[in-house]
């Protein structure tokens, strides 16, 4: 009889020990990511769930999405946040909801508010965002890696790389991209475009980079490997896209939360590089891309 009691006591102890982390995890206040419905649809609900799950494990606290209507005013966003959690650990806002972030911080001074500014211009006014953590995408680091990735995909063919880049990225992005090629003995030739209308058919094209411009190129189905800076659900992207650069709030959440917890009022966050088509890239190029981080 005593042995049975001891046995069941041990089993109960093991079960309790296993349950404690689960209980503690769900007892912790969540991180909230505010997003409008159009972005949620673009990114993909199942993809958001996966990213939130991984971020939750990384931070050891729940990460939840606050869905706001595309035309939501600042007050409506407050209601949407309150419906998800009345006591969040931190709330992440995209730049388009900057006014809602400021209002939330005024009403909830005990909760950290983070504004993810993405690739917004450096000279944008930020004085109005006092007491709000503001983080940007690390454009130079991203384009340095994109340049290295494009060179790896070229694989020494000495072909041409078409780089479609929105105007506001031209200075920092272009310089960083070129730096990635500068150390190569025989670098591929990058050709920069601000829009697809400037582009015409090019022979010896080994790679295409789409960074805020030139998305029309994907309609060509040319077979040339494409590096795409986008939030679009990969399941909706043509097979020519071999590498996606993702700076969405769900990807940036863990880093942003740690920076805010450390008291960093501003800072830069790198994007995630997601390989979609390993066979089209090739094993050697894939190894080089992974080495870039």
Question: How would you label these PLM feature ranges?
Answer:
Residues 74-87, 194-204:
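Short, well-structured alpha-helical segments in soluble
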Residues 30-74, 170:
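Extracytoplasmic "Venus flytrap"
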Residues 92-95, 111-125, 226-232:
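Short beta-strand elements of ligand-binding domains
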Residues 142-185, 264-284:
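An alpha-beta-alpha
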Residues 71, 135-143, 164-175, 191-198, ...:
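Hinge/beta->alpha junction and helix N-cap segments in small-molecule ligand-binding domains
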Residues 239-293:
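Structured C-terminal subdomain patch of bacterial secreted/periplasmic proteins
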Residues 8-21:
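Hydrophobic membrane-insertion alpha-helices, especially the h-region
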Residues 122-148, 238-250:
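Short beta-strand elements at the ligand-binding edges of bilobed clamshell
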């Amino acid at each position: 009889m005593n042995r049975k009691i001891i046995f069941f006591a041990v089993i109960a102890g093991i079960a309790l020990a296993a349950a404690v982390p689960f209980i503690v995890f769900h007892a912790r206040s969540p991180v909230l990511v505010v997003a409008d419905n159009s972005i949620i649809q673009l990114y993909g609900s199942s993809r958001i769930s996966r990213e939130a799950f991984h971020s939750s494990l990384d931070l050891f606290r729940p990460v939840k999405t606050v869905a706001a209507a595309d035309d939501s005013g600042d007050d409506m966003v407050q209601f949407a946040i309150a419906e998800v959690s009345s006591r969040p650990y931190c709330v992440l806002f995209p730049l388009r909801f900057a006014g809602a972030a400021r209002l939330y911080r005024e009403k909830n001074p005990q909760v950290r508010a983070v504004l993810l500014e993405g690739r917004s211009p450096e000279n944008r006014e930020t004085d109005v965002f006092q007491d709000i953590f503001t983080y940007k995408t690390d454009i130079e680091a991203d384009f340095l890696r994109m340049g290295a990735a494009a060179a790896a995909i070229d694989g020494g063919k000495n072909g041409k790389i078409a780089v479609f880049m929105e105007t506001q990225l031209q200075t920092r992005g272009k310089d960083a991209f070129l730096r990635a090629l500068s150390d190569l003995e025989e670098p591929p030739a990058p050709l920069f475009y601000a829009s697809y209308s400037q582009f015409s058919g090019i022979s010896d094209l080994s790679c295409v980079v789409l960074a805020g411009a030139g998305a029309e190129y994907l309609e060509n189905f040319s077979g040339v490997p494409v590096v795409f800076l986008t939030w679009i659900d990969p399941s909706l992207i043509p097979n020519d896209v071999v590498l996606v650069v993702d700076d969405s709030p769900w990807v940036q959440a863990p880093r942003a939360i740690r920076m805010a917890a450390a008291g960093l009022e501003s800072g830069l966050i790198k994007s995630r590089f997601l390989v979609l088509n390993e066979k089209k890239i090739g094993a050697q190029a894939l190894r080089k891309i992974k080495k870039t981080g």
